[in-house]
Design a protein with these regions (language model features):
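Terminal amphipathic alpha-helical/low-complexity segments used for targeting or macromolecular assembly
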Residues: 1, 11, 54, 210-232
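Conserved N-terminal catalytic core of the sugar/cofactor nucleotidyltransferase
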Residues: 1-6, 12-30, 43-128
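Residues that scaffold the ATP/ADP-binding catalytic core of kinase and kinase-like folds
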Residues: 14, 79, 189, 224-225
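Aromatic- and Gly/Pro-rich amphipathic surface segment
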Residues: 29-37
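Active-site mouth loops of central-metabolism enzymes
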Residues: 37-43
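Conserved beta-strand segments of alpha/beta enzyme cores
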Residues: 38, 93-95, 185
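Conserved beta-loop-beta/alpha segment of the NTase-like Rossmann-fold superfamily
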Residues: 92-177
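Conserved core of the sugar-phosphate nucleotidyltransferase
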Residues: 140-223
Length: 232
């Protein structure tokens, strides 16, 4: 199935706290304070980031989008309704999955819980493979299309050359780095790496690979791990 699950359920609290340190104009800052970060307008067109992402996904060959949001998601529906051209050919659909807080909690849990709730609400995700990504990263058509190609492995992800992202050292240092073996199979993901770990995981070309949370999973193999994921 050409399915893409997009995670857009967070409160964007860290981003909103840092808005005053950005070079965004006053209008964009005001919008960013009101909406999820995936709905912030970008570029000359001022289309929301999510719309750019959906356009790239459609161009890459995806047909079914599962957008994970908080239950109060009317803003997402309002924004997407302003772009009917996305849905004009009838082969591109957006389904909404809601991430509910667990009983006794005011806030939802993390990524594993979000994906598990989406799979529970849409059982077809358990029966098929799907791509998973963040709603606040703008992935290229090329990267999204790569994960639709046939693979021998049941799961896969896109690794990015750290130096090619052109982010500040402070920002890039927060990215998880990927340990890959000689055949490019993932052996470990290192969150918040130290400078020593960065040096340790450089390859023979002095490259360090990082994750931008762009994955391909086989649903039936993934679900048991989501169900057993510890809370931390």
């Amino acid at each position: 199935m050409n399915s893409l699950v997009i995670m857009a359920g967070g409160a964007s609290s860290r981003m909103k706290k840092s808005l005053e340190q950005t070079s965004l104009d006053a209008t964009t800052k005001a919008i960013a304070q009101r909406v999820h970060k995936s709905l912030i307008p970008l570029g000359v067109s001022q289309k929301p980031l999510l719309v750019h992402l959906l356009e790239n996904a459609q161009a890459a060959g995806y047909e079914k989008i599962y957008l994970i949001t908080a239950p109060e998601n009317s803003t997402f529906k309002t924004v997407l309704s302003a772009y009917p051209s996305l849905f004009s050919n009838g082969n591109f659909q957006v389904h909404y999955a809601f991430q509910y807080p667990p009983t006794g909690h005011s806030k939802p849990l993390g990524t594993a819980d979000a994906v598990l709730q989406a799979m529970t609400q849409y059982p077809e995700l358990e029966k098929n493979a799907f791509t998973l990504c963040n709603g606040d990263n703008l992935y290229s058509k090329k990267s999204l299309a790569l994960l639709l190609k046939p693979h021998n492995a049941p799961h896969s992800l896109i690794s990015y050359d750290r130096s090619g992202l052109h982010f500040s050292e402070e920002r890039i240092a927060r990215f998880a780095i990927l340990a890959l073996d000689s055949e490019s199979y993932l052996t470990e993901i290192i969150e918040k790496p130290t400078s020593e770990q960065l040096a340790q995981f450089r390859d023979e070309k002095e490259k360090v690979y990082v994750s931008m949370n762009l994955f391909r999973f086989t649903g039936k193999l993934l679900k048991p791990y989501l169900e057993k994921c510890p809370i931390h």
